[in-house]
A protein has these predicted regions:
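Active-site HxH/HxHxD metal-binding segment of metal-dependent hydrolases
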Residues: 63-126
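Active-site environment of divalent metal-dependent phosphoester hydrolases
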Residues: 59-60, 81-85, 105-109, 161-164, ...
Length: 240
């Protein structure tokens, strides 16, 4: 059986049913090979074009649901690490364009005709309904999305918001890495994944000015509240 068949065992990880956070914006929470989990976000624009952030392998009912939302316009790989199911989803929606890091294109040149980069995407989303913001100063080629209509910020590894750890060992790890019970950047980001602190913090200050109502992270719980203050405070506490 073809490994990409919708009836095969290619969907290894479980996920929740779609949840509509706000009108025309849905999430699916999924398990992963580690305790961090993952999240797929789906945004439908006013012209019924649909963008999928961090695509996950899905069973046929959820793929049918995606198709029912409108034309699948684009698939967004949030950074160079979260691309495991991008090719699979691209096969299910062959007309969708792909927003991805340069490193992914280098490995898959046959898809170059479908690739979009952040500087080009602004011109294909009507009235900037969805903003694509590449993160400078980091080593993992992340792109953040902002949905102005709902003031929702969608990111991946720039910040985490994990629930309380269940074991003493994990609690110690969370404390060491600044990654539990608070929507914040991790120490891994600060010490290992940042290559230009000044550039990153300037970008972060611009994110804070967007003052999102919610921050949809890939790992952990969705932050609801004064997103601008949370971004400023959490980065200031960690980076100084």
């Amino acid at each position: 059986m073809d490994k990409n068949s919708l009836n095969s065992q290619s969907v290894k990880f479980t996920y929740s049913p779609p949840t509509e956070l706000v009108p025309s914006l849905w999430i699916l929470d999924g398990t992963w090979s580690n305790f961090l989990g993952r999240r797929m976000t789906v945004i439908r624009l006013r012209n019924n074009e649909v963008w999928i952030h961090n695509p996950m392998r899905l069973h046929k009912p959820e793929l049918d649901w995606l198709s029912s939302l409108g034309f699948i316009r684009g698939l967004v790989a949030p950074n160079q690490w979260h691309v495991s199911d991008l090719l699979w989803m691209a096969e299910q929606f062959p007309e969708a364009q792909i927003v991805c890091p340069q490193s992914f294109l280098d490995r898959h040149p046959s898809l170059s005709s479908r690739m979009l980069f952040t500087t080009d995407v602004q011109h294909v989303t009507p009235d900037h309904e969805l903003e694509f913001l590449p993160v400078p100063g980091v080593r993992f080629e992340e792109t953040v999305l902002f949905h102005p209509l709902s003031r929702t910020l969608i990111l991946c590894d720039l910040m985490m918001n994990l629930p309380p750890a269940e074991t003493a060992l994990r609690r110690a790890f969370f404390k060491l890495n600044n990654m539990g019970e608070c929507c914040s950047p991790t120490r891994t980001l600060k010490w290992l994944l940042t290559n230009d602190k000044k550039e990153l913090l300037h970008f972060v200050s611009q994110l804070a000015e967007l003052n999102p109502r919610r921050i949809v992270v890939n790992h952990g719980e969705i932050f609801e509240g004064e997103g601008g203050n949370q971004i400023r405070t959490s980065f200031a506490l960690l980076f100084g």
